[in-house]
Amino acid sequence: HRGEAQAEQWLRGVKTNLARKAAGGDRDVARDILGGICDIGLANAYYVGHMKNAAAGTDARKWGDGIKAIRPTFAQTGGTHVNISGAAVAKHAPHKDNAVKLLEYLVSEPAQALYARANYEYPVRANVAQDPVMQALGPLQVDPLPIAEIAKHRKQASQLVDKVGFDQ
């Protein structure tokens, strides 16, 4: 959103504020917060749903209950990054009609409700409710920057990570 110089400054700031070298996965972030290793962390939202709905007495449930999750928004755009998934049918697919039917089902209300309920994903259909755990995080404001624009800068972003030694 703000160019390479500010991206580098931001990345250096994140690195400077790391409690330890970045490692592990989304559940590890919650574990580290609960363990006092760090005060905040970044994780995919659906892990919050998995942890908060884990079986009572498990580490995952303890981690989920021990964190306060928020949906961050960027001041300039008023939105937050969301991961996306895509699907396509190959031009020469031998069973094209069935492939299209599968894709149509995947975006249907029943399938989207299943994704929301079973995996705490954000439905692509506005008329499908989010899981209550996800709703409790507040409204989702999606960063409007098109993925094609983000993709244009992937190589530069990777080079910045190397330049600031983020993984060292």
Region roles according to the model:
Residues 62-93:
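Flexible, solvent-exposed loop/hinge segments that line or gate ligand/substrate-binding clefts
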Residues 5, 24-27, 42, 92-97, ...:
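Soluble non-cytosolic domains of exported or imported proteins
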Residues 16-19, 34, 38, 53-56, ...:
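Sec-exported extracytoplasmic/periplasmic mature domains
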Residues 12, 27, 31, 35, ...:
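Solvent-exposed, polar/charged alpha-helical surfaces in well-ordered, non-transmembrane soluble domains
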Residues 1-72:
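Ligand-binding pocket segment of bilobal, Venus flytrap-like solute-binding proteins
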Residues 85-145:
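Mature extracytoplasmic/periplasmic domains
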Residues 130-168:
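Extracellular/periplasmic bilobal clamshell ligand-binding domains
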Residues 45-49, 74-77, 93-94, 108, ...:
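Solvent-exposed loop/turn segments at secondary-structure junctions
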